[in-house]
Amino acid sequence: MSKLARLEREEIMECQVMWEPDSKKDTQMDRFRAAVGTACGLALGNYDDLYHWSVRSYSDFWAEFWKFSGIVCSRMYDEVVDTSKGIADVPEWFRGSRLNYAENLLRHKENDRVALYVAREGREEIAKVTFEELRQQVALFAAAMRKMGVKKGDRVVGYLPNSAHAVEAMLAAASIGAIWSSTSPDFGVNGVLDRFSQIQPKLIFSVEAVVYNGKEHGHLEKLQRVVKGLPDLQRVVLIPYVLPREKIDISKIPNSMFLDDFLASGTGAQAPQLEFEQLPFSHPLFIMFSSGTTGAPKCMVHSAGGTLIQHLKEHVLHGNMTSSDILLYYTTVGWMMWNWMVSALATGASLVLYDGSPLVPTPNVLWDLVDRIGITILGTGAKWLSVLEEKDMKPMETHNLHTLHTILSTGSPLKAQSYEYVYRCIKSTVLLGSISGGTDIISCFMGQNSSIPVYKGEIQARNLGMAVEAWDEEGKTVWGASGELVCTKPIPCQPTHFWNDENGSKYRKAYFSKYPGVWAHGDYCRINPKTGGIVMLGRSDGTLNPNGVRFGSSEIYNIVEAFDEVEDSLCVPQYNRDGEERVVLFLKMASGHTFQPDLVKHIRDAIRLGLSARHVPSLILETQGIPYTINGKKVEVAVKQVIAGKTVEHRGAFSNPESLDLYRDIPELQDF
């Protein structure tokens, strides 16, 4: 047995439990399992039984969950899905049904309950929007949109911070049947135009400035250039955000008006009433964008019904969310986690919208909000938890956190040491849910589960209805070994199509070119046959394969970033003219530390001991910067292109595009 195989076997056998569900508490997952057993005459003893039934009989599963979730519709479906069609056929779901996404999110009638808590960097005040106020605002937005001619299928976009008005504008667009798309103010002009110019919106909402990391960032000049690049825009609505209206000059922005004037344009003698256009399940709701780090972003069209039922499944069953929960997911409107978070309104839960740095004025800012508001579910990126650990933050000692029952993490693989940190320094009784999926499905393939244990370093389980497997290069299922994450059966949350992809060729190339008829997600993972848990190993397009040994970059990161001397690292392949591959590891040194031969030796030894000799990089070099997307994801593929002498043209998706130039013409890489 190879050293790598022995290591993986040892990891599987270790299976350290970090959290277990309270056997005395009945979860919504338990209730659903019992309901399915009764309705279908099945003996489903545990989650594993339920999961395997849900993918084997996926049509029955989704029908049962439709019933369990209480989705509001004006017409019931004729057929759940044509099971003779595969996932590559993109079958129609819930044919014949009529519904509205916004109606489902606004269905809860406890008018005085808070729907939105709104918090901003540098402001002590926390604003509150009740469900009744939210409905009134959505009605105002929708009436003004209708007045200017927005109709079904039109694109309405937001270039906005994470705010109540972003939620209101999105829900108003959805109530009409318009298609919503959004990006955050930290995107530059090119990044925004790379996205919005492809979908040609009729209406855009934006702000004049934002505050981040203690600084005010003016936004009007960027907005003016964006508007110039969108010739089909009929209206620009400016929402005063940092400054009062009288101090904002929008005269240079054509077809622009302030928000209050826009809302007034749709009102008559009486306040407008909410109207929900009844639409097919497959009607487009969102256009989401790929990262665009290696080319023009793909424009993924997600359906109203597919998004709704998938998000409800994740919130209600996997997250055990109820109307008593308060959810804060630290996100911008440019990340799919914003859409995912907002859908939680359909459970009656309250949302906390935070705009600003999670480290300013102190790294405790989110924990402060947990205690002030009584947040029950906190979501963040894996990187933030690593930063807190590096700063030796111990919220367990400084905060109460008594309401917090779940911490969610996504964006990048959650390291095993982060599990230890959370349970040692944050809260010992919290469910730590690492969740993973992507913008491509606007949801998760796998994630948190309130009915089964949490094991260190593992995502708890594959989610219901998601026929996820790990495949090797020959298309065979592998267990306990690294493989390509695939989905073998249809799911309602896959994009209905790509925008401007009339013959579907881009869609097929994106997901079905590697394994015909099977969705290849582009992630590398390992499924533990003992626990059912999953370890994510990085993007498969950044998979390393020196001398025939395939592994993911995160396997290297997990070892390297345990060194205090290293602030960050990047691991990429380099190819020579003969197609031979070697692995190059770049280290960004932590403050106060220098790049030394002894450190290189220690890192090589640690990788050799922890993985195998064949995992040890051929070169370990210092770098001054590592490129990230605006959503905080490390970008390996673009660096691979740069060191191969190629040009990365689409730099708008990077938070630090200048860092790419650090990898050009590196002397040590020239003679391979």
UniProtKB/Swiss-Prot annotation:
What is the tissue specificity? Abundant in male subcutaneous white adipose tissue after weaning. In white adipose tissue, it is preferentially detected in mature adipocytes but not in preadipocytes. The expression in primary preadipocytes increases during the adipocyte differentiation. In brain, it is expressed in the midbrain, pons/medulla, cerebral cortex, hippocampus and cerebellum. The expression in the cerebellum is restricted primarily to glial cells, while in the cerebral cortex, it is restricted to neuronal cells.
Q: Which top-rank group of organisms is this from?
A: Eukaryota
Fetch the CDD domains from UniProt: AACS
One GO cellular component term: cytosol
Q: InterPro entries annotated for this entry?
A: Acac_CoA_synth, ACAS_N, AMP-bd_C_sf, AMP-binding_CS, AMP-dep_synth/lig_dom, ANL_N_sf
Catalyses which reaction(s): acetoacetate + ATP + CoA = acetoacetyl-CoA + AMP + diphosphate
GO MF annotation: an example: acetoacetate-CoA ligase activity
| Location relative to the cell | Cytoplasm, Cytosol
Q: Which UniProt keywords apply?
A: ATP-binding, Cytoplasm, Fatty acid metabolism, Ligase, Lipid metabolism, Nucleotide-binding
Has UniProt tagged this entry with the keyword Ribonucleoprotein? no
Known role: Converts acetoacetate to acetoacetyl-CoA in the cytosol. Ketone body-utilizing enzyme, responsible for the synthesis of cholesterol and fatty acids.
* Protein name, as recorded: Acetoacetyl-CoA synthetase
Provide the species name: Rattus norvegicus
